[in-house]
């Protein structure tokens, strides 16, 4: 049966209707960050594991009854939510710092409920593994950041090609299949979570699956490397054509999550904006090529080693034009941070967003700080100004909140960033890491604010 979902309607009603309710459910209530601008940054920052690799990797624990031992897992809201979803299904998990051990030998509930899924779209990633190992799954339609339409349809079409019967009723995706069959799947758009879901499902399918137009993101490759360690047979890792020979069962494995290239890029932009000399450790520079190239174009000095980067900046940046696209091009998740950098640059630059609609919500907030940005469709025109001045601003989504922190580090006076529960979804204690290199940033908890 064919299913089409207008996912935007399902998503927007959740994401925009209750920003406050969303915030209260995030543990910290309505925390704020207070930033006093004008401090240079110097010292060392350790980059955490990648959120966008950790989430699918945690879900891959569902594919085996053996223990899966993970390291370098970031301590983030979205990770904790994913673990809650898994725990509700009967997965046992033990967390010790950055280590997480999963045991999915006694899964007894194949439903991912709305209360958990609505705060995080990545919960859709349990669909493929549950269907492949248990033959059925029921997953609530997702929520998460309020950024335009997301392509759940691609997941559904791919699983249907592998023989799954899927219906959408009462806000749930319900799927069943005796055993998935290998298939050739061509997605009509590149989708990271879609590639991950289909890749996990294919590992236990009967026969060969070919995923054409697969996402090439390093986080997809990291998931693939874990699956191979668990006994999966996958060719073409890192390319847009993944070939999977299904196996009867997967076994346990140990795996260390790759470093977060977006967190690393965010700190590079922070130093570029505030000025200073900072060493980032625990990084993989080669997966940051597009970002590093653009920073060098802006006049930033960057040295790279195997697992470190040193970033130095002692002048005003030059404006750089960026255009977001799929990996290995410039990442949409770094667009807002570069917009913040361009606000204080010399010259004028275009920022073109080709991946998500509705991803310029930070523009009016940056303009409140004195930036000069105009929007025309999917393009923002940024004319650099001599100085920004601190003001009260509000975070609207994860990367927008990072851009406001970067702008605040550069602005004169005090900037107050409200609703930073968005920031906590993707950054592990950002204010602590910035404070350690000389920034003046402090968190006000909901009660003080």
Swiss-Prot record:
One of its GO terms (molecular function) is UDP-N-acetylglucosamine 1-carboxyvinyltransferase activity. The keyword rRNA-binding does not apply. Its EC number is 2.5.1.7. Pathway: Cell wall biogenesis; peptidoglycan biosynthesis. It catalyses: phosphoenolpyruvate + UDP-N-acetyl-alpha-D-glucosamine = UDP-N-acetyl-3-O-(1-carboxyvinyl)-alpha-D-glucosamine + phosphate. GO terms for cellular component: cytoplasm. Phosphoenolpyruvate binds at residues 51-52. The keyword DNA-binding does not apply. It holds the Pfam family EPSP_synthase. Keywords: Cell cycle, Cell division, Cell shape, Cell wall biogenesis/degradation, Cytoplasm, Peptidoglycan synthesis, Pyruvate, Transferase. UDP-N-acetyl-alpha-D-glucosamine binds at residues 121, 150-154, 333, 355. Belongs to the EPSP synthase family. MurA subfamily. Cell wall formation. Adds enolpyruvyl to UDP-N-acetylglucosamine. This is UDP-N-acetylglucosamine 1-carboxyvinyltransferase. The gene is murA.
